[in-house]
Amino acid sequence: MSDELVLQAAVELLEAVSRGSQRKKMERLIRPLEIALRKAFREQGSLLAKKLRQVKRYFAEGGDPFKQHDAWLNMKFSEALPPNEFNAIWAQVQLETVKLFAKPIDDAVAKALAYGGIGMLGELKMKLSFDLANPRAGDYLKEYGADLVKGVNETTRDILQTLITKANEEGWTYKRTAEAIIERFEEFGVGRPQDHIDSRAHLIAVTETGNAYEEGSRIVVKDLQDAGVDMEKSWSTVGDGKVSQGCKDNEAEGWIGIDQAHASGHQRPLRFPGCRCEERYRVKKSE
């Protein structure tokens, strides 16, 4: 092997070590965030089940007439619960639980953003600094957190609307409805092991820390470009059999300008929730 190839291999190894160190820090954020979101989903589900008592007029008594003490739990839907009334209850639940989601997400995203920026500076061997005082980082955190929690709650609401509709149509008792709600929120937290499905809590944690890490890297590169350094990027997959065709197509492009969209239309990973790809950057080589 020539000296030039040895040097290139050594440089690539150092870059990988630098990048890997910060990425490992980011990955260590995933588990604590997942646990916090699991707890948030459980508390949200329990609170919603309790607040359904506000619409008890939509339940008709049913079940064993000799068990009067259990009458409330055995009341069944007598007419459809109007969407506006359900939405009003859900709005109360969101308001009372928003901090359970927002704080752990905000904390993890901020750290992942910083790790991404610091890791990229190390990979590029730039003797510069990066922190959350960076204007682009501040803008990202300001816009991202509120939108994310809103998106999580909107998805939850849509899932619950389907459940409530089924309860209406099949005349479920309050007890059965409440149990189904709590069970659904439990699935949000821990998934369905029998189906080998990751939980929503895990997927959100992986996706949002990954997105923030990639954004931190991109912010550093955009700042360098603004300073007159000509940069380029390349999509990188993990290279196993689970990689989607869209990500393979992005990787096949090779090195492109940092403001050029990839074949999928994305500026950077993640292309979808749970995407395992990352963006590589370098100073553009002279022609």
What are these regions (language model features)?
Residues M1-G191, K284-E287:
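N-terminal leader/targeting and assembly helices and adjacent pre-domain segments
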Residues Q194-E287:
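Acidic, glycine-rich two-metal-ion catalytic cores of nucleic acid-processing enzymes
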